């Protein structure tokens, strides 16, 4: 049975940066956001269904899902959001499981933004790692990275599980409010811990 760490955190918390560091140290990283982008990218496996369920306007000229339009469509409409999740989540789960099963590293870091919101997550992950930082820093990072307006970023944060609930579910917390070097040092310590746990 492969040792899998579930890595989660709010938008802009630094999940990808932490996951990249785990990968650099030799862990296998399976990132659900990356899988979702593949599924909804040009010619992706979900595109035909996106077109069927939501119409041609949600697929751009390159043949990819128009993420900005989809975000606007589902944010105010619970039924459409549920329809999109019912399409993508099983595909993401199946591809994640396939990649985890054939992962070459000593353990797997499974990056799942909505991990704590997922039913049964406790049974799937021997360890849950939450990447955490203050909300103001989340907003600043996302503005810099994506150029979204602050109101839209706060709307996304409000739609996610509360920070306190996420932290309560954590076995390990990576405080990503400091420097890159400080984050890397924490990842190195956690990597040593996970190597030991994976060897048991």
Positions of predicted regions on the chain:
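Well-ordered beta-strand positions
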Residues: 28, 127, 171-172
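Short, acidic/turn-prone active-site loops that include or flank metal/cofactor-
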Residues: 34-37, 133-136, 155-158, 180
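ATP-dependent NMP and nucleoside kinases share a basic, alpha-helical "lid"
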Residues: 94-102, 107-144
